[in-house]
Amino acid sequence: MIMEFEFSKMLEEVLTWIVAHLDGPLWDATIIILLGTGLFFTITTGFVQFRLFPASLREMWFGRSVEGSSLTPFQAFTTGLASRVGVGNIGGVATAIALGGEGAVFWMWVTAFIGMSSAFAESTLAQLFKIQDKDGSFRGGPAYYIVQGLKSRCMAVAFALALIFTFGFAFNSVQANSIVEATSNAWNWKGEYVGISLVIFTALIIFGGVKRIAIISSNLVPMMALFYLIMAVIILGMHIDMIPSVIHRIVQSAFSFDAAAGGMFGALVSKAMMMGIKRGLFSNEAGMGSAPNSAAAAHVKHPVSQGLVQMLGVFVDTMIVCTCTAVIILLSNNYGSETLKSISLTQNALQYHIGEFGAHFLAFILLLFAYSSIIGNYAYAESNIRFIKNKPWLVLLFRLMVLFFVYFGAVRSGNVVWNFADTVMAVMAIINLIAILMLSPIVWKLMKDYQRQLKEGKTPEFKIDEYPELRKKIFDSRIWK
């Protein structure tokens, strides 16, 4: 038997203490800022998630090829989707329902709908403020638009560190933990062996470079999503007459009050709302500041183009994939069991609908989902490591720490890694949401430029020389010549 590292046990105790003291106050602030920012951009952009939804489909589909070494819009979309479409759609939804009840699904919908406008804003800004490397590829994200747009290196570094801890360490621990739970339930695989295997296969990928990561994600994500959705549609079709009652239960339960624990607002909001918002943010990442890192890597003619593409990713993640998972769970007779939470709840629901095959099928699909999420998470975090200090030794150290946290998640308690993820993602989201609020005038300016060109019958193309006030802020304005 492979022994667990003593350090991982000590780390679990430290993380438990940190979460106990910080999670409540952090989520008080996060709920207010997350929903407030989403509503602000929804209103000030004239409900961009409705008006420009058809344009987002065009931008994604017709951006499948580009010359040079930068990512295509489609690859940037699927890299973002690799992180969005994963454990959050399967284990996250199940956890939300287990802890927050049926109504948590409604609040996941609300978070996604409002968050689509925040996702649009953050990814548009990431495109504008991106920089170009020597090999011709692009990189960027919140740290880049904070330091250029707000001229705050300290705030940018704080965000970069928060993202590194969230995606490089915490979220990858969650992904590994979920793989272990799924494979243990289906095939009785031991966590230690699964953890070591994940470390090996992750190492093979993360030393291959971001371009390679994008290619793998581009190939895997559509296939994974398609398989999972086909299975979901088959199950929903088998119970089509029961779906209206399930939707009614979701909406009705959303407004029943059962106070959530922790923080000032823990006594003012329901468990359904708290868990729906937490798991909704974990799943779709709208406004968190993660997707802009892949959005910045895309080669597009106008910043708004990639903002629309990433907005579409939020819709696909929550309104389609998460909803399918939720309905599958709520249609099963085993919903509400005290012993079934997270991945095991979803596996049990599938087993109820389609037999033993369901548990095995989900374990295989989740293995692919979670592994691709680890790849996408790493890509986000590496970009921010290079922002802080682009030194080979630091990148190497970071990669080794990523591998450690993958193993840590595989062998430690699910409650510990999920709570750790909740806490650090709240810090990351707060910093990013404040930044995009402060940069909102730039978002409006770019959107007006895009819409003006559409009305003139042109393919929108951003010319930085027409906006000298923006050219002065951007480090690499040659990109938009």
UniProtKB/Swiss-Prot annotation:
**In the UniProt record, which is one GO cellular component term?**
plasma membrane
Subcellular locations according to the entry: Cell inner membrane
Transmembrane spans: 30-50, 96-116, 154-174, 196-216, 220-240, 250-270, 311-331, 354-374, 391-411, 424-444
The molecular function terms in GO held by this entry are: amino acid:sodium symporter activity
Instruction: Give the family per the record.
Output: Belongs to the alanine or glycine:cation symporter (AGCS) (TC 2.A.25) family.
Highest taxon, organism lineage: Bacteria
Where is the major localization of this protein?
Answer: membrane
Protein name according to UniProt: Uncharacterized transporter HI_0183
Membrane topology term reads: Multi-pass membrane protein
Q: A Pfam family in this protein?
A: Na_Ala_symp
Q: Which UniProt keywords apply?
A: Cell inner membrane, Cell membrane, Membrane, Symport, Transmembrane, Transmembrane helix, Transport
